[in-house]
């Protein structure tokens, strides 16, 4: 306490007690900061194949991945935002190749729909190694890397998955082999004498892999159960584009872009498989370049999207949340 004696009297100023301040802070923290454990779904399936959630280890493995998605907020929000732009590209390719729609969630487990590079050298949304990409028809060299071409890489992934399904006779094992490698998973199945993914003892990454896919699917389909209240307007919209067929060498890609009212940066953003300033093409291959339509890069182009009345994948109205 500080006491000041003046002519008019005595003035007393009370210095705040630090313990009181800390106590108030802790009280506010306890009142407002709460973490709830999300409930697991009663049933789950992948590509129409049932997940044995009655098995304790299976249930706890799914719980681990759902917790990861639930509390890695920025990563999961990115999943929702990117998926609204890229699922419309991926889904029809899966359908055309008779691959179950659930495999779009495999791309989330691989890269969260971003052009990632793994420590092992796998690249692109579908995370192909150089050798595997070439095996499934992708051009990979210093100037062109079609692992970054979402359409072609999705087609290549479909070819692999169909071959794996033909061999294993099971979509879940086919998905697991995408992570472990065909030979590695086949060896595990043969040595352990089981034909069910959920009965296999696997390396940690592959042991978690299917559960990560399942968790992505569950949270995508029931986001508000896990605390994600998102409006359609929160998502990245599909960008309006057109294509140009190129079957000759393009010596100067920055100039090619400029002639079309674009920058080299925009050309690369929409064609990340191009890795140089030129597009050599002595063999006269056909390349398809994707370019944005006029004004497609302006935020105002998408401002007329109809406002959401309810949250994504939920009947709860936005004005009813409390």
Short names for language-model regions:
Residues 161-188:
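Catalytic and binding regions of secreted/periplasmic enzymes and modules that target cell-wall glycans
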Residues 253-281:
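LysM (lysin motif) carbohydrate-binding repeats in extracellular/periplasmic proteins that recognize
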Residues 99-114, 174-180, 267-270:
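Short, functionally critical alpha-helical segments immediately adjacent to catalytic or ligand/cofactor-binding
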